[in-house]
């Protein structure tokens, strides 16, 4: 339960519409973080046509860095797309999150600097993410890894991009993701009074991320209203969800996006995919960017590591049986 005092504070902070410049300046304050984690990092790039897509690699150990840039390594990798409503945030702002992710999972983390709306509307941010994923899966980055050891992960708008990249990869057939992790993903297309989801109505005004702000984000991301019907814009619009990766979805109890993420998980499962969905009790949208001392973050990494380790074990058993 949330105290009355905390609820009053949250309500006071949950007001207004999205103003792009001020929202970006506020997000950039994260770069002043005095508790930043210093890991071995490497900046590289992928290409979406003629456009360079910067990526930053985070290595949990010296050994991982040496192995990661040696051809043929099987060190596991998380390909990460950051949140921010497709409008704010950056690789630099998510530096601590990605460093902690590398430490907590013992994975190399590859964070993608996709272009932002409204300067670059749908599908440009998605195509940047897809290009980075394709480069990683086909060993066109400086990092060489086993595609079976890659997991795509994203939070909020990054969860949307993760789901959309996996749909696009299935449809285009250029590479095959085996796992995706969606952290409070934005997979719907409506946050008005017409929304079918209870969480939009219950949590859409008092818990930092509001329904009004979500509508603003969608309006800034879309080219026209028609985009909202596109499954690559709103994965919940996809009617055929077969043949998608093993999926872990984490939602937050006090998040307007909670129900749509859980519904997406159920639809994936009905379509025959292996899916785990966990609701983090007492959590708000955005909690994953908090420090590791927060219990909600610790709980999330227990689910993430359990999902990753179980998937690797199943795949190893399958690979062993296929060689007999």
What is the role of each PLM region?
Residues 31, 39-45, 51-324:
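Alpha/beta-hydrolase superfamily serine-hydrolase fold, recognizing
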